[in-house]
Amino acid sequence: MDADAWNQRYDTAELVWTGEPNRFLPPEVAGLDPGSALDLACGEGRNAVWLATQGWNVTGVDFSATGVAKAERLATDKGVSGIWITADATDWVAPAGGYDLVIIFYLQLPAVERCAAVRTAMSALAVDGTFLLVAHDLLNLSEGFGGPQDAAVLTTVEDILDDVTSAELDLGLELVTEKAGRVDRVVSTPEGERTAIDTLVRVHRVS
């Protein structure tokens, strides 16, 4: 989906997604001291806004102007603020080393564009910073519930680690993978609980 399609999807009074953070975000950042955080492909802002409520100085970037506007409204409703930018995560020029935490949640792109987005994230990551990515895993297509039904935009752990390594070499960084694996996510439906399968990768920048 392009920016126009997402603008149409987000053009509702209500949030398309819940206003609460993704279930994996709070536990994965629980041990970090709040600093500056970047949410690439922030959508309606639920993760960025939650980080702001926890004391982070947040910047949210998304190519949907409608999504960005809703993120700003959600922040206002929650009594927090942030910097909200309409831009494409694959080619946005981020402040080099400007963020202590960079997150990408469910940015489902073909391989070349996904690799570019991960490079953007790594270029923005400060020394001693943390990168966290969660995405719909390829295995979800055959064994999980929901998510895109196009294998070309689904991920594997190996895909993301390859993207990270590519960015590490290209940018001359030293990165350490702290966590990389598939994780299950329970989804409530009218028919009962179902299980979605996600990719989760967390990386620390050493230098």
Task: Write out the residue ranges for each language-model feature.
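Conserved SAM/SAH-binding beta-strand->alpha-helix loop
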Residues: 64-66
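A short acidic, Gly/Pro-enriched loop at the edge of an enzyme's catalytic core
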Residues: 93-101
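Conserved beta-strand signature within the Rossmann-like core of class I S-adenosyl-L-methionine
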Residues: 128-136
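Short alpha-helix
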Residues: 152-172
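A short SAM/SAH-binding and catalytic strip from SAM-dependent methyltransferases
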Residues: 100-114
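Conserved SAM-binding strand-loop segment of SAM-dependent methyltransferases
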Residues: 77-90
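A short glycine-rich, Lys/Arg-flanked "PGG" loop and its adjoining helix->strand segment in the class I
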Residues: 115-127
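Conserved class I S-adenosyl-L-methionine
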Residues: 1-32, 139
